[in-house]
Amino acid sequence: MRTITVYTDYKSPYAYLAKDPIYALADECGVRLDWLPYTLDIPSYLGSAELNADGSVARSQRTAHQWRRVRYAYMDCRRQANKRGLTIRGTRKIWDSSLAAIGLLWVKRQGDAVLRAYSDHVFERFWKRELDIEDVAVIETAIGAAGADAAGFRDYLAGEGREEHDAIRAAAESAGVFGVPSLVVDGELYWGREHLPDIRERLLAEKASPAP
């Protein structure tokens, strides 16, 4: 079965919005998805900020231009989420999503079904502000809720998992990846869910006219 590589990050609302359409694309076109984490370094291009509980700015290292981009991004994502009955609540800080990403690598070893269940759980709860992706106990619970075995996860997180996560990120950047969601089809990079119709058209055309 043909494999499409998908880079994702749980702290990206755009990756959340792309998840289900990517599932549908794979099911329709008969391809396998190889989900890989790409942990975004948001402060490097959007600055950083932390909000109080009432939404006021507690600390900020953002320019006015960066604030406009961030505010528009959340408005745009909520607009799309509302059309699909999803909840996207703006975060109060920039989260380190690498722990949840290493959780993805852990459950991936236990099958596609538990990987989907884990991602569904983490994305939905995180964007409702119901899940702390920086808490290892919370991620262990998410692993169990997905039907995966969490025994040994902490050792994996501290050693092999962290090394694998960092190596995947470095390899992704060497291949040109800079954001999520990113899909790689036969070595060709597509960034953003707006390219899913093009990928679908390409895959279905190739499926209808297989190479001799």
Label every model-predicted segment.
Residues 2-34, 112-113, 117, 121-212:
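C-terminal cap of thioredoxin/glutaredoxin-like
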Residues 17-126:
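Structural alpha/beta surface segment adjacent to cysteine/selenocysteine redox centers
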